[in-house]
């Protein structure tokens, strides 16, 4: 890609989506010896989706909370991401994604400067962005939420916290085999 766009800045990012909802994220909790811990929750089946973009080399992240996943919203997420990172004629981003239907459809609108690279089917272990969810779920773990908007608010707060944790994110997502800048 650097040869094809000589003189342009090139960055390598990864993107994935996670579904969160009123069905709770349960985590272990501390309890006194001999006492059974109790994690209260309310079960529900409304969902929201967190789109996570990560640059493993630096630990930079970009987040979007959207109501669903589909080609139209993925195209919108790509546009917003391209604006955020300044992708265009002079800056190109190779974005690693899985082969979800909304990533591969012919209707996907890919902004100038964004280039999609698809992982092999059924290989989430190769996706650095997949490792983000353990961090984002901390904001909603063991929480009791009445409405999906409460989860979105908690997610938003957690994502803002993570913006300053680039070292932690880099350590979690920058696989030893992930290409590095020369």
Predicted segments with their positions:
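Short catalytic/ligand-binding loop motif for oxyanion handling, primarily in non-cytosolic enzymes
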Residues: 21-23, 103-105, 126-128
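Short, aromatic/basic amphipathic alpha-helical patches
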Residues: 105-113
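RNase H-like polynucleotidyl transferase catalytic core
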Residues: 35-43, 112-131
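Acidic/histidine-rich, metal-coordinating catalytic segments
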Residues: 78, 89-103, 127
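Short beta-strand segments
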Residues: 13-15, 93-97, 117-120
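Extended, low-complexity cationic-aromatic segments
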Residues: 1-79, 175-176
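C-terminal anion-handling pockets and recognition modules
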Residues: 8-12, 129-182
């Amino acid at each position: 890609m650097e040869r094809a766009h000589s003189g342009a800045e090139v960055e390598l990012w990864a993107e994935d989506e996670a579904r969160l909802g009123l069905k709770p994220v349960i985590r272990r909790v501390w309890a006194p010896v001999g006492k059974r811990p109790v994690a209260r929750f309310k079960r529900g089946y409304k969902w929201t989706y967190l789109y996570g973009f990560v640059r493993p080399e630096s630990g930079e992240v970009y987040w979007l909370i959207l109501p669903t996943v589909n080609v139209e919203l993925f195209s919108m997420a790509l546009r917003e991401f391209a604006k955020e990172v300044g992708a265009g004629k002079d800056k190109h981003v190779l974005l690693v994604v899985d082969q979800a239907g909304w990533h591969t459809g012919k209707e996907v609108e890919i902004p100038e400067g964004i280039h999609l690279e698809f992982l092999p089917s059924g290989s989430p272990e190769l996706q650095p962005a997949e490792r983000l969810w353990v961090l984002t779920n901390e904001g909603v773990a063991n929480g009791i939420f009445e409405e999906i908007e409460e989860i979105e608010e908690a997610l938003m707060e957690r994502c803002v916290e993570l913006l300053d944790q680039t070292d932690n994110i880099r350590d979690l997502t920058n696989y030893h085999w992930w290409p590095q800048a020369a």
